[in-house]
A protein has these predicted regions:
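Internal alpha-helical transmembrane segments of multi-pass membrane proteins, especially GPCRs
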Residues: 1, 42, 74, 78, ...
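Structural signature of the GPCR N-terminal helical module
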Residues: 1-30, 36-37, 43-61, 79, ...
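Hydrophobic alpha-helical segments of membrane proteins
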Residues: 5, 9-12, 86-89, 93, ...
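Loop architecture of class A 7-transmembrane GPCRs
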Residues: 18-35, 39-40, 62, 68, ...
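Helix-loop boundary elements of multi-pass alpha-helical membrane proteins
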Residues: 54-75, 145, 167-176
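Intracellular effector-coupling site of seven-transmembrane GPCRs
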Residues: 142-194
Length: 203
């Protein structure tokens, strides 16, 4: 939610730049603030999605402890933002860290001057969350499969119902797999091209 609000607050600046034929009218400080806010919000959004996948996995693995996890959501969110702001604030020590990206009508990291930063940013805020998301949803799918097998063993009473119940379990597993594929797919479609483009431009 905070990520979306932060990104939304920066949209008027880009609109003004488009209207002004690509001229940035908010000064160097405005560009730094805007570039930092957009970068931090994108990173926080990736990690938030990652934490959601971990929370879902824990909820399935330990259903009776789910209420305990919910109580700590606020504190986890604070730690998340502290982590994101801490490693993104490194660039604030450099005057030319954020510049106007003319093709996008917005301010962002100075990719050409600080390629190492872009590489590390992609590793920490794109690759690592993606690995965790893929891993947790694969584990979720395996847990659903195991759970369905246990239900099948405990509920099958006769040969006549066995086939129907197994078909139902297979259908449930397939639907769970589709959800996993959709979530991971959307994440990758949204962020991998952006990350690859930044890396290619930096190198």
């Amino acid at each position: 939610m905070m990520c979306d609000l932060l990104l939304g607050a920066m949209i008027p600046l880009s609109i003004n730049t488009i209207i002004s034929d690509g001229e940035w009218k908010f000064g160097d400080i405005g560009c730094t603030i805007s570039g930092f806010a957009i970068t931090a919000a994108n990173c926080a959004a990736n990690w938030a999605l990652c934490l959601v996948s971990v929370e879902r996995y824990l909820a399935i693995l330990y259903p009776f402890n789910h209420s305990v996890y919910v109580q700590y959501v606020k504190y986890i969110s604070i730690v998340l933002w502290f982590f994101v702001l801490a490693h993104n604030s490194v660039m604030l020590h450099y005057d030319d860290a954020f510049i106007l990206i003319e093709d996008m009508y917005m301010c962002g990291p100075n990719i050409r001057s600080y390629p190492l930063y872009i590489v590390l940013l992609n590793l920490f805020d794109l690759v690592l969350p993606n690995i965790i998301i893929v891993y947790t949803y694969i584990k979720i799918h395996k847990e659903v499969q195991r759970h369905n097998r246990e239900i099948a063993v405990n509920t099958l009473r006769s040969t006549s119902t066995k086939g129907d119940d197994l078909d139902m379990n297979s259908s449930t597993e397939w639907k769970a797999a589709l959800v996993i594929i959709a979530i991971v797919g959307v994440f990758n479609v949204c962020w991998i091209p952006f990350g690859v483009g930044m890396l290619a431009y930096a190198l």
